[in-house]
């Protein structure tokens, strides 16, 4: 078998044979890796005959079986339909408001330009399809929030309030947005709130969800929706008072214990609610009806996943279930759902509480004066064994895992254990799964952060369980996905932030910026060999921030606390401690020089950690970034970081809680001073820039 034939198949399948790594070196994927990934895509490539057969499969997939269910186009641009219809074909175009336009395609078989963004129903020669007309750009921060916008980022699970039972919830989030707004913030970015597995309580990373279409019900605050009296009664009935108080006192979240107690409590609340007579029943019924098939399938999955355990009591991947349950549309699944209708309704009840809680938090944010409000966080993928993969099997690739090639931060690469969309599945199904995901994550927010925004164009995919180095980039229908993102952002009047760190293809940042999608610049990364960029060197097409959840806090970095942690967990040998410290001292001296103008201190003297945090936040205020986001950890001067990538057991990832009640979290003298100085500097700098 020739490598030439293999490469032809790989390229036809959307795989990038050649790529540029983080060190700007050209790389080529090994033939063996290509064959492994192609096999996971259902394309055999062991022999020339295999390749010929696989090319025929691709030809059929790419043909979509005729006219595709959805096409995208920019507003003010003609849509080329020559691949599907002859010139001068008669058409009828129906807008979402019911308005109808009739006409003929031009001599090049193009549909005349449409000015108004939206979804249109196009009929030609008895064929019907949807045409998505996208605005040229997402709403910009300047359009939504003005010229001096800034906000904070917080981990939802870390928030505290009296009676929270050991985990941050939407009621604490309401208090947090009010507290942040009181200090002048326009936005609060939060960690992902995607649905997890109710039957797999040890999986709690918010970036490894069961579904990005629904919510983690453990963050629901039922008392805020149903009332405190029903909540107290349910706690008493369950005998959970002492346990909830114990969990609330912990410094680190005990996720399994929290999940057990909250699920018991939610079930009791549902049972009480279901007795009838609750005026909120109408709202719940409406929510469930509007959720449609997607909500029903998620709830059915949760019940099936709980019931279908193996002999050892471990939950199973849905692909290992009895065959009659692997298809969500099967008669067996319908029968199971009818038999367990009460349990299915219970899971819908939890989703209702979460949706209403997030809605309340966004209303509270805007009412308190935030111009953007909540910024949701969209994880790059979902667990291949989860409800989204089960219910959207034609649109997700469950046999491949998303990750990242070796780069500056992770020299061994990364395998995130989550599945990606199928490029062909999306196109063949009218991008249904993608659109519904965008809508779910924009429904209760004024903005959305897209984790690893590179995934709109390409994703590093690895066979499940394989070494992350043995992967390849899989390309996606980028233009279509970008247009749909712009359209949904426009419909929701939301700003879009794209996390563009790591290995980025040349020119991608410019394309995203032209579409109004803000990139991200992190203070600790904006340097070369200890020489940090000045605020003026930051781009005006990206947000600026001090740190992220995957790297040290400013205080922790300044003190070298992260070095101690890396040695403690075995990422770095003890013998490298001195070298690590020397490198850090060089970088710290460079940042100290960069901050001297904003510290008011002698530039020849090393700043204290507290003064460095003050100066760093003031530094960010002077960048031309249209939006600056300050992590709550840095606003408070905390030392510990949220997550250490690649570490599971030896560092408390996703378990840390903030030191005070959300209603007053930012009101300490140090954080109040820090935020007041930052807000004033932001106003002054942006005002000067526009004079």
Report residues per predicted region.
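Active-site-proximal helices and loops of the catalytic beta/alpha 8
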Residues: 362-363, 381, 385-408, 462-568
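Short, well-ordered coil/turn segments that N-cap beta-strands
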Residues: 148-150, 184-186, 368-372, 444-446, ...
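Hydrophobic faces of well-ordered beta-strands that scaffold small-molecule active sites
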Residues: 150-154, 188-190, 372-376, 448, ...
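Conserved alpha/beta catalytic core and glycan-binding cleft of carbohydrate-active enzymes
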Residues: 271, 280-283, 500-639
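Acidic/aromatic-lined carbohydrate-recognition and catalytic surfaces
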Residues: 42-76, 80, 86, 94-105, ...
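Low-complexity, glycine/alanine/valine/leucine- and proline-rich hydrophobic stretches
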Residues: 636-668, 672
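Active-site-adjacent "subsite" loops/lids of carbohydrate-active enzymes
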Residues: 217-218, 384-432
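Active-site-proximal loop/turn and secondary-structure-junction residues that shape catalytic pockets
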Residues: 158, 194, 378-384, 454-456, ...
